[in-house]
Amino acid sequence: MLLVSFAALILASAYFSSSETGMMSLNRYRLKHLKREKHAGAMRASRLLEKPDKLIGVILIGNNFVNFLAASIATSIAIAIVGDPAPIATAIILTLVVLIFAEVTPKTIAALYPEKVAYPSSILLILLLKILYPVVWMVNIVSNLSLIHI
């Protein structure tokens, strides 16, 4: 069961990573054109892109949450299998797994096919933004306050 949970979390991380790249890689002129034609995915993506701080916020909150949870589960699995030296080995293996399957590959696919990634992913992103809005709002406030001194 832990392995299934771990795999699901890596897939969730891949979703967030690809969503970020897909949304940010959309051609704005084509997006505007499709929005005028009432393309549902373009309308959703456009709405999300109107507030990029909230979009990036919800993506980063989701991605960090699933990555930390995946790390915890991976450590539990490794300790059960290997024992004490597991945390170091887990960190190395998890870094490679996340880089390959949850970062580089999904982001590359999204950069190549932004519309195919961004439009469908906008459905869940809108839902997550509604659910996590208070957290996103708070993170953005703290982040903006930290930028005042820069």
Predicted features by range, described:
Residues 1-148:
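Membrane-embedded alpha-helical segments of inner-membrane proteins
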